[in-house]
Curated annotation (Swiss-Prot):
Keyword Transmembrane: no
Lineage of source species: Eukaryota, Metazoa, Chordata, Craniata, Vertebrata
A Pfam family of this chain: Jacalin
Known role: May play a role in protein trafficking. May act as a linker molecule between the submembranous matrix on the luminal side of zymogen granule membrane (ZGM) and aggregated secretory proteins during granule formation in the TGN.
Organism: Homo sapiens (Human)
Protein's name according to its UniProt entry: Zymogen granule membrane protein 16
Primary subcellular site in the record, as a coarse category: secreted
Keywords on record: Cytoplasmic vesicle, Extracellular matrix, Golgi apparatus, Lectin, Protein transport, Secreted, Signal, Transport
Gene Ontology CC terms: collagen-containing extracellular matrix; Golgi lumen; mucus layer; zymogen granule membrane
GO BP term, pick one: defense response to Gram-positive bacterium
Signal peptide stretch: 1-16
Family matches, as Gene3D superfamilies: Jacalin-like lectin domain (2.100.10.30)
Key word Cytoplasm present: no
Family annotation (PROSITE patterns): JACALIN_LECTIN (PS51752)
């Protein structure tokens, strides 16, 4: 009898784990092989992505900075080029990222759930298009490699935070 009870408990536990929905996914890494690794994984604890700063020059994406909630991440990349800054509307999220690269990142296009296309950089190179694997998930943070330019980018998707006291 004890064996039957333990077996039933084990099966119930296994089936409960099997039906838990997965929500996180990863796209990338898009770009070349150089640069020093960076990750904003800890920044997502400050809240959802609320703004983007992208530095561009004639040919490449030079640098990136992302605002999570009300807190800006560390800047990654170089200092030469024009800095562009775009704020998301309250409750707006990035649901797709496309772009182009060769040895370095050349173009980024962030698409939001409000239908906005936020485009940075030049239209040349190998194309990529990244979307989350799971429904109802959004861009939560970025990672990649950088030096004097953005060498590569990775995109991390998950559910929009249900609450954010610092947003």
């Amino acid at each position: 009898m004890l064996t039957v009870a333990l077996l039933a408990l084990l099966c119930a536990s296994a089936s409960g784990n099997a039906i838990q929905a997965r929500s996180s996914s990863y796209s990338g890494e898009y770009g070349g092989g150089g640069g020093k690794r960076f990750s904003h994984s800890g920044n997502q604890l400050d809240g959802p992505i609320t703004a983007l700063r992208v530095r561009v020059n004639t040919y490449y994406i030079v640098g990136l900075q992302v605002r999570y909630g009300k807190v800006w991440s560390d800047y990654v990349g170089g200092r030469n080029g024009d800095l562009e800054e775009i704020f998301l509307h309250p409750g707006e999220s990035v649901i797709q990222v496309s772009g182009k690269y060769k040895w370095y990142l050349k173009k980024l296009v962030f698409v939001t759930d409000k239908g906005r296309y936020l485009s940075f950089g030049k239209d040349s190179g190998t194309s990529f298009n990244a979307v989350p694997l799971h429904p109802n998930t959004v861009l939560r943070f970025i990672s990649g490699r950088s030096g004097s330019l953005i060498d590569a980018i990775g995109l991390h998707w998950d559910v929009y935070p249900s609450s954010c006291s610092r947003c």
